[in-house]
């Protein structure tokens, strides 16, 4: 989430169309059913969504009566967020330098944005800094084995059946261009230990971890495929009081 060309500005229209109002399969059927209850659980008064994109999750939280600020470095996405939620609070900013006072928020959300942030060694301490003591950092992220396979995907047999999902260079951090459904952006791969060390070094305590399964109303074929290679994890980290 810096000034470098990461593809997000040119991919913004395709991204917005792909998300719609309800999100893609992973958000709608896997992550939202966990992320929304976790976000509401402690009745936070002030929430920051880091890497809010076009503002979909901000709108979900605002419909629940929360005071939400969304930040993103991509002008087109912030413009779309403001257009869809004229009463909302959205700002162009990077995760590595949050323009907020210390201890300003009860809850900070990173909803599939860590993979887009070039410098998490700067960003995670910033998220911890703006949390009040006792506040939570709620994270949805891609499993690191998934980002170690972004250029390969499923290996298929001659009949087109999915055989296995290979990973390579898992311990080597990298930034890779990925393309899907008209979107072309940079994703950052890091081993799980990189994220955990950064969160622990920021003084945060892990209080919740899940690899959520699709909800019962998810499309059956996609749910079966997800069960073979689950893409997502959810973590909640608390700043000690």
Language model features with spans:
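A short acidic, Gly/Pro-enriched loop at the edge of an enzyme's catalytic core
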Residues: 96-107
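Class I SAM-dependent methyltransferase SAM/SAH-binding core
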Residues: 48-50, 54-97
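A short glycine-rich, Lys/Arg-flanked "PGG" loop and its adjoining helix->strand segment in the class I
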Residues: 121-133
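A short SAM/SAH-binding and catalytic strip from SAM-dependent methyltransferases
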Residues: 107-120
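Acceptor-substrate binding/catalytic loop of class I
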Residues: 145-148, 179-193
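Short alpha-helix
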Residues: 187-209
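Conserved class I S-adenosyl-L-methionine
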Residues: 1-43, 56-60, 77-80, 136-174
